[in-house]
Each structure stands twice: as structure tokens, then as C-alpha cells.
Amino acid sequence: MSGRGKGGKAKGKSKSRSSRAGLQFPVGRIHRLLRKGNYAERIGAGAPVYLAAVMEYLAAEVLELAGNAARDNKKTRIIPRHLQLAIRNDEELNKLLSGVTIAQGGVLPNIQAVLLPKKSSQKTK
């Protein structure tokens, strides 16, 4: 009798909560920030996992669209302009980030239809 209790397993290598959830975003850090931020008296164990998953999904979505915008402009590096184009051309992201100003993002190219030259139906001879 070695005093170990009833034949329990030896503790193996520790595994982060992010890797358990299959996420890249840090679940532990988000949990700490939720506790320190005084958002609520208590924070459940699932809340930081869910929040990390949502944040990771949004980041992946924006980066995917910004990468496409960069490729369309024949660039290999994403700049704020590509982020702006990606967000403003996507209906849902534009609604979510409508109050956000992106520094060095520029504006969407848009010319009102009335300002465009008239299409003449008859050809001049």
C-alpha cells in the first residue's frame, strides 16, 4: 500500500483548454479577462470557450475575405485597405462593423448612376 488511493491513473501531460476545444484562440486568457473585466460576478466554464470560438470564426472570416481582396489586387500582403474592402463588400460583416472606422482603409469606389455619362441610343455618322 503506497497511499495513492484506489489505483488511479498517473497524471499525464497537461492539455490546454484551447487544444481540448480545438481552437487557436487562448481560452485561458479570455477566461482571465472575463473575470478581471467585472462583466459578471461569476463566469461559467463554457463561456470563455464559446467566446473564443466566436472570435476565432470572425477573425477567420475577415482574413479569408481580406486575403481574397489582396489577391484580386495582385498583392501578397493584407493591408488595411483590403480589410476595408472585405468588410464593406460583405453585407453581414458591414452591418456588424458599421460603427467601426478602419485607419488607412479608404472608401468603397462608388459613382452615382446619375453622374455617369448618358448612353446614346443613336450612332453618329
From Swiss-Prot:
Protein name: Histone H2A
Predominant localisation class: nucleus
GO molecular function annotation: DNA binding; protein heterodimerization activity; structural constituent of chromatin
Bias type Basic residues, positions: 1-18
Source taxonomy: Eukaryota, Metazoa, Spiralia, Lophotrochozoa, Annelida
Keywords, ordered alphabetically: Acetylation, Chromosome, DNA-binding, Methylation, Nucleosome core, Nucleus, Phosphoprotein
UniProt region (Disordered), positions on chain: 1-23
Localization per record: Nucleus; Chromosome
Chain positions with N5-methylglutamine modification: 104
Pfam family, one: Histone_H2A_C
Quaternary structure (record): The nucleosome is a histone octamer containing two molecules each of H2A, H2B, H3 and H4 assembled in one H3-H4 heterotetramer and two H2A-H2B heterodimers. The octamer wraps approximately 147 bp of DNA.
Metal-binding listed as a keyword: no
Post-translational modification N-acetylserine, affected residues: 2
Family, per entry: Belongs to the histone H2A family.
Chain positions with Phosphoserine modification: 2
Organism: Urechis caupo (Innkeeper worm)
Free-text function comment from the UniProt entry: Core component of nucleosome. Nucleosomes wrap and compact DNA into chromatin, limiting DNA accessibility to the cellular machineries which require DNA as a template. Histones thereby play a central role in transcription regulation, DNA repair, DNA replication and chromosomal stability. DNA accessibility is regulated via a complex set of post-translational modifications of histones, also called histone code, and nucleosome remodeling.
One of the record's GO cellular component terms: nucleus
Domain of life: Eukaryota
